[in-house]
Amino acid sequence: MARGPKKHLKRLNAPKAWMLDKLGGVYAPRPSTGPHKLRECLPLVIFLRNRLKYALTGNEVLKIVKQRLIKVDGKVRTDPTYPAGFMDVVSIEKTNELFRLIYDVKGRFTVHRITPEEAKYKLCKVKRVSTGPKNVPFLVTHDGRTIRYPDPLIKVNDSVQLDIATSKIMDFIKFESGNLCMITGGRNLGRVGTIVSRERHPGSFDIVHIKDSTGHTFATRLNNVFIIGKGTKAYISLPRGKGVRLTIAEERDKRIAAKVAGQ
């Protein structure tokens, strides 16, 4: 009988968003337990080795993190399989680089560099609002943070702008029609658009209808929607493509136009 946590992850079973080649070995780095789920995170070893190419092997990544050079959300992380996830700020002081982990329109974590000003805060989705012992109100965010005494206007599915240094709420964005959101799950992963409407289905999944900046509409489940801005103004910078997914034909036309312009 198996006892205790699983310690291995087969390469074929690793999330597609990690973009590991399936013939590169039998196993993949299994993320440690932490603030993000296994299938929604990116271990530091993959970010440093496969994305940034700062190391060739896992052993080199271990040597980098053990020098206490890598910070996630302002805290030094020395575990190479630490699960960094959506909206986390990864900072490397030695190279003066700052990154925010965010999805591209193909649903993969992209290397998205940000300014020092933007690296001071992150957005967190509110997962739960409740009262604790002695009637102290608190909320729980998507990355496992518990924040006591929040603004009573903050409800589930809203987003809070969190100061990383102090873990204090700077601002919050309501979940309502007309606000900008990013999709964090399902087949529309990584797309950005404004909320059009919300269909309530008690006992089942609420459906949210979203319209992107090119006028395309799509729908997804409520728990896949992450509010990132008031109106059309995003609180964070977006990666290349601005969260607009092109159809295959549109991608082809864009490539041909670029080729013609380059000749």
From Swiss-Prot:
GO BP annotations, alphabetical order: translation
Domain S4 RNA-binding: 42-104
A Pfam family annotated for this UniProt entry: S4
Gene3D superfamilies noted in UniProt: 2.30.30.30, 2.40.50.740, RNA-binding S4 domain
Superkingdom as given in the UniProt entry: Eukaryota
Keywords: Ribonucleoprotein, Ribosomal protein, RNA-binding, rRNA-binding
Listed GO MF terms: rRNA binding; structural constituent of ribosome
GO cellular component assignments: cytosolic small ribosomal subunit
Residues annotated as signal peptide: none
Protein family per UniProt: Belongs to the eukaryotic ribosomal protein eS4 family.
PANTHER family per record: 30S/40S RIBOSOMAL PROTEIN S4 (PTHR11581), SMALL RIBOSOMAL SUBUNIT PROTEIN ES4 (PTHR11581:SF0)
Name under which the protein is recorded: Small ribosomal subunit protein eS4
